[in-house]
Amino acid sequence: EIAQCLVGSEMCIRDRFTHKRVSNARSVLNGIMSYAIEEEIISHNPVSDVNFKQFTYKPVEVQSDNVFSRDDTHKLLNYLRCIIEPYSLAIQLSFYLFIRVGETKAIRWEDIDYNNRLVYLHRQATCERTLNDDLTFSSRKVKVVNQMKGNTSHGFRKQFLTDEALKILHKAKELNPNGIYVFEPNGEIMTTDSFNRRLKKYCKEAGVPYHSSHKIRFYNASTAFDGNNLTTLSYLMGHSETATTLHYLRNVNKRKNDRLAFQNLGISS
């Protein structure tokens, strides 16, 4: 739909799409056109002729309520405590760490330092699809890469393990004592889609509104922020700029210190 608008008129885009959505579509179209030029299907990229400054974009809505609340988080985690399976445990652990879902999926047992109560984040699990010669895409394949989101060194970091986080890992070890990765449902690495499908299922069963795995990071950052620890949070979140971290803040609390930031996550002891 956006592609049709780009080759149409300014009126077609006006106030219908956010700047981010149009920018994402532009990137995809540029990639397709570049491929077509390489294959000598076309000689010129028509997307480069579009003046994107002419468009009036749809304002981004304030989404302060589009995250987990503390009450809903406690309700969900209390419900999940009795469900001992990989997805439940992965969801629970996500509420106790400043972690991306791709990083959660890629945690190996060797990354856990029980003596110092730390987990080291060295990699992420992603899904990739290959563009075929007929311009169709192959089926998705899970791939673990030693490269973090944003392709910067800021993604490589360590996280403190609270008592609750350690309990979750012990349960995961009982389920999967010989696996390479901590969470391996049916002996395979979980996908983000399957993670979110299970999260949605459990939210419904627990009677709380569903939000995606990414919104867990919004909740954790907001819960741990005290007005003074933005730099610390930015490191823990794996961000290269504090401006990115500010985007995640919804509600704030008054606490300071690296490890104390973790004490507010999940269900506080």
Model-flagged regions — what are they?
Residues 1-8, 13-15:
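Single conserved hydrophobic/aromatic residue that forms the stacking wall/gate
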Residues 70, 160-208:
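Active-site/catalytic core of tyrosine-dependent DNA strand-transfer enzymes
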Residues 20, 38, 92, 96, ...:
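C-terminal catalytic core of tyrosine-transesterase DNA break-rejoin enzymes
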Residues 59, 125, 230, 237-262:
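Catalytic-site neighborhood detector that most strongly recognizes the C-terminal catalytic loop/helix
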Residues 52, 107-171:
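Conserved tyrosine-mediated DNA breakage-rejoining catalytic core shared by Y-recombinases
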Residues 19, 23, 27, 38, ...:
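Basic, Lys/Arg- and aromatic-enriched nucleic-acid-binding interface segment
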Residues 30-33, 37, 88, 252-253:
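C-terminal flanking helix
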Residues 3, 21, 25-29, 86-87, ...:
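Hydrophobic (often cysteine-bearing) scaffold residues that line and stabilize catalytic clefts
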